Swiss-Prot record:
Mg(2+) binds at D71, E140. It comes from the Bacteria. GO terms for cellular component: cytosol. Catalyzes the ATP-dependent amination of UTP to CTP with either L-glutamine or ammonia as the source of nitrogen. Regulates intracellular CTP levels through interactions with the four ribonucleotide triphosphates. Its EC number is 6.3.4.2. This is CTP synthase. CTP binds at S13, D147, I148, E149, K187, T188, K189, P190, T191, Q192, K223. GO terms for biological process: 'de novo' CTP biosynthetic process; pyrimidine nucleobase biosynthetic process. Residues 1-266 are annotated as: Amidoligase domain.
Length: 544
């Protein structure tokens, strides 16, 4: 039967619950445990699909087309054998929506619908369903202990601990042990109060993960254990690390996996973390450095491009290259030519996905620079659409645009997808008036690459599967004039013949794709497209 480890956070947000939980999952997986992970988000949005990247960061897309929290990206990157799906992320909004739909159908037989038991029962059913078929399920609860929004989730966890018993449920709590510079010491009181807050709602942590930017002394560890009623060996020190991929080793060296296996009655071999050691060794000991200019409109918050950042890091690990990302505000680039110096200093240029017209002229400016100066260029999603628009305007000399930016454009080289088949093979129909949430081409889709194209050479195959998140596509009636002018259409969707990729034959490395390759990159091997891109950047740097 599935065992559950619930993960909560206290004192402050952004402690790294997702990374810590994923690191623990990686260690358990290295011991042969079949493990999965789920993120519970207390906000009322049904999913993060329409949330501002400035507030929420990246939206991570799963194979089955779910728009989810960026922590699911960490889960997939740390785990070898588990892929996330719609069942691995749910919000308060989704829970309430499900309960209200049941009430409308009369499933509660006219009863008064309440937070307890109806909302908590729905949460419990989702948790249990997400763990089916696995040895261990790690359940991360978003937010911070004490937040009013998370109380129904905390109550559901409390009930599950009682119902499942000690041998099937554990609670792991992350907390901050701050260092007070003026006093020259770390302070345990915030951790004590965080656990006190948990205990006030009926939850006692079995494991404490103590986050700090300074060393925590053995005396403070004993003090934390004494005043939080947690075994001393279950008080785990987790200081800031040079690489997040060091965390599995950090947890393992403090015997956290042994403690969990003992509690759950799991007799398993020792964890083999040699793969993680190799990743860390390559990351911390690069042999060269390249700079990638990322031109976007959410660059003030790097988490908005978390999977791309990680994919570039993974490619750097693969080639033993330190990939430095120089973020350029696309909107500022439109009018500030001084920012062109950053493009000049870059070894490669990347334009990521995005929505809306704001900043597009700055991105087009960067694409023109990359094309004319033979700088390696990678366009993703909107980055491909703008590469097509740039080429049409500056090479074909037509006033091309996207109907997303100008519905009345005379040359709609990019247009709204009105019909397509989703990941289940079901017909989806959209219009300009459709809801924004959940109305895109989402999830894993098959594509066919043109034999002999650069992209086919990069993948080593002509049939690939990549994840998508977009509602606009290239207009196929422009394929012939573009190809006659020198742009190669190198990939098409397998069923609808939608354009998936373009490239330039007279450019050392100019590739743009409609899909999102960053979602499937791994620290153990990277992703073929990003690996090739970083290699091209390295070659460009060496040839300067």
């Amino acid at each position: 039967m599935t065992k559950f480890i619930f993960v909560t956070g206290g004192v402050v947000s952004s402690l790294g619950k997702g990374i810590t939980a994923a690191s623990l999952a990686a260690v358990l997986e290295a011991r042969g445990v079949n493990v999965t992970m789920t993120k519970m988000d207390p906000y009322i949005n049904v999913d993060p699909g329409t949330m501002s990247p400035f507030q929420h960061g990246e939206v991570f897309v799963t194979e089955d087309g779910a728009e989810t929290d960026l922590d699911l990206g960490y889960y997939e990157r740390f785990l070898r054998h588990s892929k996330m799906s719609k069942s691995n992320n749910f919000t308060s909004g989704r829970i309430y929506q499900n309960v209200l739909n049941k009430e409308r159908r009369g499933e509660y037989l006219g009863g008064t619908v309440q937070v307890i038991p109806h909302i908590t029962d729905e949460i419990k059913s989702k948790i249990l369903a997400s763990g089916e078929g696995y040895d261990v399920a790690i359940i991360e609860i978003g937010g911070t202990v004490g937040d009013i929004e998370s109380l129904p989730f905390m109550e559901a966890v409390r009930q599950m601990q009682v119902e499942l018993g000690r041998h099937r449920a554990m609670l792991m709590h992350l907390t901050l042990v701050p260092y007070i510079a003026s006093a020259g010491e770390t302070k345990t009181k915030p951790t004590q109060h965080s656990v006190k807050e948990l205990r006030s709602i009926g939850l006692q942590p079995d494991i404490l993960i103590c986050r700090s930017d300074h060393h925590i002394s053995p005396d403070n560890r004993r003090k934390i254990a004494l005043f939080t009623n947690v075994e001393e060996r279950a008080v785990i020190m987790c200081e800031d690390a040079q690489s997040i991929y060091q965390i599995p080793r950090t947890l393992h060296e403090q015997d956290l996996d042994d403690l969990i296996c003992e509690r759950f009655g799991l007799d398993l071999p020792e964890a083999d973390l040699s793969d993680w050691d190799k990743v860390v060794e390559a990351q911390l000991n690069p042999e060269s450095t390249v700079t990638v200019a990322m031109v976007g409109k959410y660059v003030e918050l790097p988490d908005a491009y978390k999977s791309i950042n990680e994919a570039l890091l993974h490619a750097g690990i693969t080639h033993k290259v330190d990939v430095k990302i120089d973020y350029i505000d696309a909107e500022r680039l439109e009018d500030d030519d001084s920012l062109l110096a950053q493009l000049h200093n870059a070894d490669a240029i990347l334009v990521p996905g995005g929505f809306g017209e704001r900043g597009t002229m700055g991105k087009i400016k960067a694409i023109t620079y990359a094309r004319e100066n033979k700088v390696p260029y990678l366009g993703i999603c909107l980055g491909m659409q703008l590469a097509v628009i740039e080429y049409a305007r500056n090479v074909l000399h037509i006033d091309a645009n996207s109907s997303e930016f100008d519905r009345k454009t005379a040359e709609p080289i990019i247009g709204l997808i009105t019909e397509w088949l989703d990941e289940r093979g079901e017909l989806q129909i959209r219009s300009d008036d459709s809801d924004l949430g959940g109305t895109m081409r989402l999830g894993a889709q098959q594509a066919e690459l043109v034999a002999g194209s650069k992209l086919a050479q990069i993948y080593g195959a002509t049939n690939i599967t990549e994840r998508h998140r977009h509602r606009y596509e290239m207009n196929n009636r422009y394929i012939e004039p573009l190809e006659q002018a020198g742009m190669t259409i190198s990939g098409y969707s397998a069923k609808q013949h939608l354009v998936e990729s373009v490239e330039l034959a007279d450019h050392p490395w100019f590739v743009a794709v409609q899909f999102h390759p960053e979602f499937t990159s791994s620290p153990r091997g990277g992703h073929p497209l990003f690996n090739s891109f970083v290699k091209a950047a390295k070659n460009y740097s060496e040839a300067k």
